[in-house]
Amino acid sequence: MIEDNKENKENKDHSSERGRVTLIFSLENEVGGLIKVLKIFQENHVSLLHIESRKSKQRNSEFEIFVDCDISREQLNDIFPLLKSHATVLSVDSPDQLTAKEDVMETVPWFPKKISDLDFCANRVLLYGSELDADHPGFKDNVYRRRRKYFAELAMNYKHGDPIPKIEFTEEEIKTWGTIFRELNKLYPTHACREYLRNLPLLSKYCGYREDNIPQLEDVSNFLKERTGFSIRPVAGYLSPRDFLSGLAFRVFHCTQYVRHSSDPLYTPEPDTCHELLGHVPLLAEPSFAQFSQEIGLASLGASEETVQKLATCYFFTVEFGLCKQDGQLRVFGAGLLSSISELKHALSGHAKVKPFDPKIACKQECLITSFQDVYFVSESFEDAKEKMREFAKTVKRPFGLKYNPYTQSVQVLRDTKSITSAMNELRYDLDVISDALARVTRWPSV
């Protein structure tokens, strides 16, 4: 006990050491960029002594920020990864007692450690609001573009813990949803996997899945939270593979709220709320599938760009376009198929090329966005796909392990004996509970 107290005191003294630190970092020349970074200092109660900016000498699109601050070691450790998520840190000049010794973690890409950290990456969309490609069905429709901008602003203003804004959908949007809902429901009994068919009626009962009603994301999120611990977070558009998979690690599904253009209800060049609600949500309500999705997300945290791309491709050919075997027949569990009438028919037509799911092969397959896939991968079951992905995840090169804590909705970085011992103690308790339960069942089999 004395030794523990001594160690705690040393750790406390160590973390409370303060000093004057100079940081230089570069930012993209965009609206609000500096405000986001300064907010990091404010929220971590760091006193800024001096700040100035200058045009970057390396890139015209960037400018450099010089910050002089009074900060503790603990604060420096807290804000450094947050700064790296918004800016490129060029220089840190600090007293020796505040400079953390270099280790392999310095080379690891920033990743969220707790669910609220998703606020730092959920708005890094690749396309924003009314910015539509020229071949988009709504490109020339100014009313539709304004509507898309409205949905984008709602998502960009969302923060973890906020209720998802309720939407009053237009008659045109409801009609578009209704067409998709009606046509897909004709195919589901003969094409969708049994887990999907089991959960869809529950969504009709508790979340208002009907032909004449577009479900509210807040209602859907609350339903999923009770079923599998997943929650919904509104997003303005496409996220990078790294940012999207990061959400899955915390059982957060980034979900669009906008509806595709009404000129072609059966086609969309991008994920819309019809795709999310009809394709993804019913299976996110399935515990085994939810676990599978989260494990792909966890494998992506801190991984290299090459590895993240491989994981994203495996996600694409399972969660988006995966097939499985049930009762001797092929069935669909991929959301991209379950929300596309024509490709759903094609995938089970007997003319599509199918292969057994193998992550090492699937990760090299080209993902097609505007046409049917060249090949579809078949899993024996969700458990089979999960086991194969677990083996694949073991090949991810990271100088640490990760353990998700569902109570705090955070990830524990396992990189030393202390953190690993702590994780083992938690596991030992869980095993004791199961062991005790087995003993009781054996003792009183009729209970």
Curated annotation (Swiss-Prot):
Q: What is its pathway?
A: Aromatic compound metabolism; serotonin biosynthesis; serotonin from L-tryptophan: step 1/2
List, in alphabetical order, the Gene Ontology terms for molecular function in this entry: iron ion binding; tryptophan 5-monooxygenase activity
Q: Which residues form the signal peptide?
A: none
Note the Pfam families from the entry.
Answer: ACT, Biopterin_H
**Binding-site positions, L-tryptophan:** Y238, R260, T268, S339, I369
Q: Which domain of life is it from?
A: Eukaryota
The consequence of inactivating this gene is: Mice display impaired hemostasis, resulting in a reduced risk of thrombosis and thromboembolism, although the ultrastructure of the platelets is not affected. Blood platelet counts are normal. Defects are caused by inability to inability to mediate protein serotonylation of small GTPases during activation and aggregation of platelets.
- Name this protein carries in UniProt: Tryptophan 5-hydroxylase 1
What gene codes for this chain? Tph1
